[in-house]
UniProtKB/Swiss-Prot annotation:
One of its GO terms (biological process) is tRNA modification. It is found in: Cytoplasm. The lineage of its organism: Bacteria, Pseudomonadati, Pseudomonadota, Gammaproteobacteria, Pseudomonadales. This is NADPH-dependent 7-cyano-7-deazaguanine reductase. Keywords: Cytoplasm, NADP, Oxidoreductase, Queuosine biosynthesis. SUPFAM superfamilies: Tetrahydrobiopterin biosynthesis enzymes-like (SSF55620).
Amino acid sequence: MHPAAEHSPLGKSSEYIATYTPSLLFPIPRLAKWAELGVSGDALPWQGVDYWNCFELSWLLPSGKPVVAIGEFAIPCDSPNIIESKSFKLYLNSLNQTKFESVAQLQACLAKDLSAAAGKVVAVKVSTLADVEAQGVTTLPGQCIDALDVTIDNYEQPQPELLRCSTERVVEETVHSHLLKSNCPVTGQPDWGSVVVEYKGRALDHASLLTYLISFRQHADFHEQCVERIYLDLKKLLQPEYLTVYARYVRRGGLDINPYRSTRAISPENLRLVRQ
């Protein structure tokens, strides 16, 4: 468990405060987990973003009439802190009985508070239900590898030694899996996800990738660190010209978290999958 997470509200009984309370946000420094991976915060080997989507966003108009919407928050992957998810939910719930003059005022408030907690500017978008409904759901790009026949009996820790690739053949391809699962390091609750890998480099053995992803099944870590571990393990093996790892996790507590790590400075689309 991350030392800072022990002091967060995650896994503890909490009072639900219904009026604006930005102090509920609980930042957790990324540095300790980066150190575990052998990564320096001064020279990160990736670019990217963490997309958070909130499906339980509500506030009051000046008349007292409530509004519901869906919030999208883009936290830079190089921000000093992640925001602990339960504290994020409690903070958003504190808006439920708070009046805002306009959506613009709400967005400015959210951006100010979340940026302060993350330690870097967080982009905020508030959408109507109709706008999000019109977007529908999408599918991951590339070939799904989930039908491959693999055997595995160890799920406690990620096993990069399972990964295999060709040392003679270079390919450019995109593959994905819906079998990613890890556990919350604080509560032990399951985190279900889908992950897409896009790269140009040594040809990755698809069955070995699937087995490797399944090896995360009982691993306890936050979403962001799981994706960063996958990225680093693949980067070491494939020696790619470029590499992207993008995970879309199933929501818990009205929030889903979607980390994106890449060698390239390309902003991904934040489009929902069928399980989201």
